[in-house]
Swiss-Prot record:
This is Early E3 22.2 kDa glycoprotein. Glycans are attached at N20, N61, N76, N88, N126, N139. It comes from the Viruses. Keywords: Early protein, Glycoprotein. The keyword Glycoprotein applies. It comes from Canine adenovirus serotype 1 (strain Glaxo) (CAdV-1). The lineage of its organism: Viruses, Varidnaviria, Bamfordvirae, Preplasmiviricota, Tectiliviricetes.
Amino acid sequence: MRFCFFFFCFTASIFCTTGNSSDIVFCCAHTPCLLHLEVDQETSVTWIDSNTGQIPLCLSNGTCHISEKGLHFSANFSKDGLYIAIINETNYHAAEHYYLVYIYENCHQMPYDSPRHTGHKGTSFNWSMGLWLVKCSHNKTFFLPFVLDSAKSAPIIMTETAITIYISMIFLIVSLLTFLNVLITLNNKYKHYGV
């Protein structure tokens, strides 16, 4: 049982960090959502829906729009998907990957007195532990503890590096508990044989 848990943690860590790196953005369904990307005015940014390889369909039907803050989705839009921001400026070209995941249940505003932290790229959120299906790039999925945002309109952005560190911390804690369990078992065994 312990071996299976260790194997799960290790596999999940490798599983989600291979391939193209992408930020995982959680948003409450039926609320506004933002794929946060702030660049200079001289920088050109083109948003692409990875499923079609074209600009997102929501831009033409009015359910999303682009601003200097990034790609905004309206409350009428609630579709998961991988979006790519192509960044072009002088002597610099890059692509940011965002996997948008909508949460339909148990996604509500947390109490105001909950501890607050600063997330990736300045996103503010509350910690709320639980299990959720995390989707990585290229439809990779697995379960791991998650965090929920304190305000429905602000998404949580977790990089895959952060997820790897998160899983590594869990792995370390479980390893220490297992080591203590082994020590206690050996101690009881020696006492039983009078050593």
